[in-house]
Structures are given as structure tokens and as C-alpha cells.
From Swiss-Prot:
Record-linked NCBIfam families: kdpA
Record organism: Mycobacteroides abscessus (strain ATCC 19977 / DSM 44196 / CCUG 20993 / CIP 104536 / JCM 13569 / NCTC 13031 / TMC 1543 / L948) (Mycobacterium abscessus)
UniProt topology in membrane: Multi-pass membrane protein
Alphabetical UniProt keywords: Cell membrane, Ion transport, Membrane, Potassium, Potassium transport, Transmembrane, Transmembrane helix, Transport
One Gene Ontology cellular component: plasma membrane
The protein, known as: Potassium-transporting ATPase potassium-binding subunit
TM ranges: 5-25, 71-91, 97-117, 142-162, 188-208, 258-278, 292-312, 387-407, 422-442, 500-520, 548-568
UniProt lineage: Bacteria, Bacillati, Actinomycetota, Actinomycetes, Mycobacteriales
Family annotation (PANTHER family): POTASSIUM-TRANSPORTING ATPASE A CHAIN (PTHR30607), POTASSIUM-TRANSPORTING ATPASE POTASSIUM-BINDING SUBUNIT (PTHR30607:SF2)
Function: Part of the high-affinity ATP-driven potassium transport (or Kdp) system, which catalyzes the hydrolysis of ATP coupled with the electrogenic transport of potassium into the cytoplasm. This subunit binds the extracellular potassium ions and delivers the ions to the membrane domain of KdpB through an intramembrane tunnel.
């Protein structure tokens, strides 16, 4: 099949499926978080809890009818997350004496710390080989569970911010974190994951509690083939925008992603919740135009990145690439350029980080676009929850800039954006660039770093430039809770394990704290009626301002770093 036709069919299928799911799934998620009798972000008294939910609240000694201010909401979220880090760390350290160990011993302290932080922060950065490091019990009880709850945590923050925009309560209550966490996990993530797992099973994705299978090759030698409960974890890996593979090759492995159809299904699973959350936002604020405007910004950025990556990888350079007809190094033949490019842009535009191709083998322009996709803040369309609250924070900054241009006090959906609000929004946006640039700068300054780079050499050579891009990609991935990597960089040293672990922690929880503080301050305000001079946050004009703000922030912050890495590599 012609490559352009294949690309068009895949993109068309994904867009059609998202369009079909947009209204029903978006409205359903709004009902999950606002109760069955009202789509307004009102109190929790209208929510009907299921028996399973009531049992969980009873065991956890949680009063589901009690609401929390932003401080209480934040403390609950942080307490739950850090308890999860400790549990997952201990589980890895004692897995050798637990059932289903498969003969695997305890995970080393550095790897256990990095992995615990990685999965709790929804990053799923993997500095280990899953088949030879993690037991099936650790995968199922530890990592798979975190795939659900870490995604649900992102959902809770997005919903809390929407409530902050909508509500006008004197106490600034944002809801109940525990209720939002449980309902997001049980009513959204679990059903969708079950459906996707069944589809993947039909395509040949494996599901086994056995650790390995012994086969005999054609030459008579024995072959040790790793097995695992792949389908169940593969589904939530994509639905929850997690990305950590149960097998080392991730979604390039035929046991995880066997066919072109399964590849498209996984792409759809990655995008469906972040895209449909814009409808949830529309429904909860009572204005359908708001979500469509946000979606148009996401779609513009996503489409631009997809066009750039597809063009870069479809333009053969060199004799081997010209013979193949495209830049096929590091890509699976069963997916080709269209499937690999669409998957790569989807996984870096969200916080997923799953891969069906080797990103390190992409061209300088293609790989640079993937880095930039993360450096935009992963808002096109972003991770589960994280993409929505990230792009709404940038919308508030765009409103502030627009207000300054017209000489009016900035307002966002009737709420004034004053010094406290813009400070919280700015701090939320500045965390990631600080972590990326500081982490990259220190790492390349260390003399030991070159020993861990697959590409190094004299300064200014293509190899050394690509080595810099590998380090930049690593910290962009960690700080944005993405988890993908340029595989040429070895990250098993204590420095990378610790520094990337801290980048994941701070990159996840500092923006959450600032976003919830912003939501709390907005919730206490009364709405100001719109007037003739109000800057409306819907329509093409604001969409353009919003998109321009996103690109301007990224360009001013990261252009020097990109010029030293992928841009320099592309022009050499």
C-alpha cells in the first residue's frame, strides 16, 4: 500500500473513532465527577456511590460526603503518592522471597527507587530490562496497580481545577480527593482498559502468568522466550498514558503490539481520554465552545508535529535509506513510517512514553520534533488529566497577556486573574524548564557522562551533538513524566538514577501543588459578568492567542538548547 494512503487511513480511523467517542465519553466523565443528577460542578451530595466504592471508603475510613479545600486535597494526594512510592520500593526489594518470583532476586536499591518514583509519577521511565528484573507479582501487584492510580491522580487534579473555575464557595472547596481517585479508577480507567485488553487479545497480544517458554530454534539450539500477563497491562499502559512496557522492546515487541490494527488501537487508547476530557471541561463549565477551543489548540499543535515527523522520516537520506524508500532504521516493518510516526507523536504529545520504534534512530529533524513535543509541556493533547490542567494553566497565562494588551483586568470564565493567580500559573509552567535545563547542564558538564553516551566525540562533531540530544531528551522525558528515551544513553549510573528520579518527582508534584493552589484561589471568587470589553476564551482569536503563547514560551525557553542539539545536527 502507498505510504501516503496508509498514513491517511490510519489518521482518518483515529480521528473518526475519537469523534464518535467525544461526546458520550466526555459527558460520561463529567457525570462521574459531578453526580448523576447534575452536570454542574456542585457538591458531592448528588453522587450515588456503588457498593464497591462504599466498601473502599469504609476500609479507608473516608467520609465521601466531606469536601476538602485545596490544602486538604493536596495533602491527601501527596500522602497517597508517597505511600505508593514506599510500597512499590519495598515490593521490589523483597520480590525474591515472594510468590511468582520466577527465580528473580531483589531489585537493587537505585533501580528500585527510580522505578518506584517512575511508576507513581505516571512517568514509567525504565532503567532496567523488565524480563530479567521484575517478577510477575511485582508487575501485577505493583506496577500495574500504579498504572491505574497514577493516571487517576492526574484526573483528580484536572477535575479540581475545573471545579475551581466553576465554583464560587467562600471556603474554596474543590471536592474530595479520595472520591475522585476511586471513581476515576473504577468507573473510567478500569472499564476502558478491560475493553482494550480484549481487543488486543484478539490481535494476538499474549496473556500468561508463566515467566518463560523454552523453544527449539531451526538450528537445534534452545531458545528462552519471556512470557508475562501482557494484554492486561498493555491496555492500562496506553489508556492511562503510562507507557512502561512489560517487555523490554515495549510496543515494538510482537507480544505487546502484534499487528498494524493493534498499533492503531493502542494509539487510539493513548489519545481517547485526553481528547474527550476537553468535552468534560465544556460540560462542567456549561459552555461547549470552551472545550472545542482547547481541542483546536491541541489539534493544531499535534497536527503540526505529525506533519513534521512524517515528512522527516519519509525523506530518505543515504544509499540504504533510498533503497528502502524511507528512513526505516529502528522501525518495525509491520508498522512502517506512518504507524511509527503517528505513534511517536502521540506518545510524546501525551505523557505516555510507550514506543513502537527506536526514537534514537529517528532523523535529526524527526527526533528534534519529538523532543519539542515534550518541551511544549505535553499538552497536545497531554496525559490523562495532566494535559487538560496543563493547557488550562497556559490558557490563563494567555488571558493575562491578552488583558495586558487591551488594558483590562484579565478574567478567565468570569474569574479575575490577579497577582496570586498568575503567580501560581507561572510557577507551574516554570518548573519543567528549570528541571530540564539544570539537569541537562549539570549532566553534560560531568566528565563521567561521556562514558554513558552511545554517541560522543570531539565538540562540534555530529556524534557529540547527538550525544547532547540524548541527554536533553532524557531530562525532557523525566521532567514531563513521559518515560521514553533516546536509547543510546545508558542511565544505570547512580547519578542518572538519582537525578532523573528527582526530576520525575519534582516535575510531577510541584506543578500539581501550584495548580491546586490556583484552583483554590479561583474557587473563592465570585464570577464577574462578561462585558463588551471582556476577552472571550473561545473562538479563533483566542485559540490563536493560546497557541501563540504555548509556542512563545517554549521558543524563548528552549531554543538555545535545541540549537545545540537537534537543530545543529540537522544542518550539519
Amino acid at each position: 500500500m502507498n505510504s501516503a494512503l496508509a498514513a491517511g487511513l490510519q489518521i482518518g480511523f483515529v480521528i473518526l473513532a475519537l469523534a464518535i467517542a467525544y461526546v458520550p465519553l466526555g459527558d460520561y466523565m463529567a457525570r462521574v465527577f459531578t453526580g448523576p443528577h447534575s452536570l454542574r460542578a456542585s457538591g458531592l451530595s448528588t453522587i450515588k456511590h456503588s457498593r464497591v466504592e462504599r466498601l473502599i471508603y469504609r476500609v479507608g475510613r473516608v467520609d465521601p460526603e466531606t469536601e476538602q479545600t485545596w490544602v486538604g486535597y493536596t495533602l491527601s494526594l501527596l500522602g497517597f503518592s508517597f505511600a505508593s512510592v514506599i510500597f512499590l520500593y519495598v515490593l521490589q526489594r523483597i520480590q525474591g522471597v515472594l510468590p511468582l518470583s520466577g527465580g528473580l532476586g531483589a531489585v537493587s536499591p537505585a533501580v528500585a527507587f527510580n522505578t518506584a518514583v517512575s511508576f507513581v509519577t505516571n512517568t514509567n521511565w525504565q532503567s532496567y530490562t523488565p524480563e530479567t528484573t521484575m517478577s510477575n507479582l511485582t508487575q501485577m501487584v505493583g506496577l500495574a496497580v500504579q498504572n491505574f492510580v497514577s493516571a487517576a491522580v492526574g484526573l483528580t487534579v484536572a477535575v479540581a481545577l475545573i471545579r475551581g473555575v466553576v465554583r464560587t464557595t467562600s471556603g474554596g472547596e474543590l471536592g474530595n480527593f479520595w472520591v475522585d481517585l476511586v471513581r476515576g479508577s473504577l468507573r473510567i480507567l478500569l472499564p476502558l482498559s478491560f475493553a482494550v485488553a480484549l481487543i488486543l487479545l484478539s490481535q494476538g497480544t499474549i496473556q500468561s502468568v508463566y515467566t518463560h517458554f523454552e523453544a527449539t530454534a531451526l538450528d537445534g539450539t534452545a531458545q528462552h522466550i519471556a512470557l508475562a500477563p501482557v494484554a492486561s497491562q498493555e491496555a492500562i499502559k496506553e489508556i492511562g498514558t503510562n507507557g512502561g512496557g512489560i517487555l523490554g522492546a515495549n510496543s515494538a515487541h510482537p507480544f505487546e503490539n502484534p499487528t498494524p490494527l493493534s498499533n492503531v488501537i493502542e494509539i487510539l487508547a493513548i489519545l481517547i481520554i485526553p481528547v474527550c476530557l476537553t468535552r468534560t471541561y465544556s460540560t462542567m463549565v456549561g459552555d461547549k465552545r470552551q472545550g472545542l477551543t482547547v481541542l483546536s489548540v491541541m489539534g493544531t499543535l499535534f497536527g503540526g508535529m505529525l506533519a513534521l515527523v512524517t515528512w522527516a522520516e519519509s525523506s530518505p537520506r543515504g544509499i540504504a535509506a533510498q533503497a528502502a524508500g524511507a528512513m526505516m532504521e529502528g522501525k518495525e516493518v509491520r508498522f512502517g513510517i506512518p504507524g511509527s510516526a503517528l505513534f511517536a507523536v502521540s506518545t510524546t504529545g501525551t505523557s505516555t512514553g510507550a514506543v513502537d520504534a527506536a526514537h534514537d534512530s529517528f532523523t535529526a529533524a524527526g527526533g528534534g520534533a519529538l523532543i519539542l513535543n515534550m518541551l511544549l509541556g505535553e499538552i497536545a493533547p497531554g496525559g490523562v488529566g495532566t494535559g487538560l490542567y496543563g493547557i488550562l494553566v497556559l490558557a490563563i497565562i494567555a488571558v493575562f497577556v491578552g488583558g495586558l494588551l487591551v488594558g483590562r483586568t484579565p478574567e478567565f470564565l468570569g474569574k479575575k486573574i490577579g497577582r496570586r493567580q498568575i503567580t501560581m500559573a507561572a510557577l507551574s509552567v516554570l518548573v519543567m524548564p528549570a528541571l530540564v535545563l539544570v539537569g541537562t547542564g549539570i549532566s553534560v558538564a560531568l566528565s563521567t557522562t561521556t562514558g554513558y553516551q552511545g554517541n560522543s566525540g570531539d565538540p562540534g562533531t555530529p556524534s557529540s551533538i547527538h550525544g547532547f540530544s540524548e541527554v536533553l531528551y532524557a531530562y525532557a522525558s523525566a521532567a514531563n513524566n513521559n518515560g521514553s528515551a533516546f536509547g543510546g544513553l545508558t542511565v544505570t549510573s547512580h547519578w542518572f538514577q538519582a537525578s532523573l528520579g528527582m526530576a520525575m518527582l519534582l516535575g510531577r508534584f510541584l506543578p500539581i501543588i501550584f495548580t491546586l493552589a490556583l484552583a483554590g484561589s479561583l474557587a473563592t471568587q465570585r464570577k464577574t459578568p462578561a462585558s463588551a470589553g471582556t476577552l472571550h476564551t473561545h473562538g479563533p482569536m483566542f485559540a490563536g492567542l493560546h497557541t501563540g503563547t504555548v509556542l512563545l514560551v517554549a521558543a524563548l525557553t528552549f531554543f538555545p538548547a535545541l540549537a545545540l542539539g537537534p537543530i545543529a545536527e540537522a544542518v550539519l
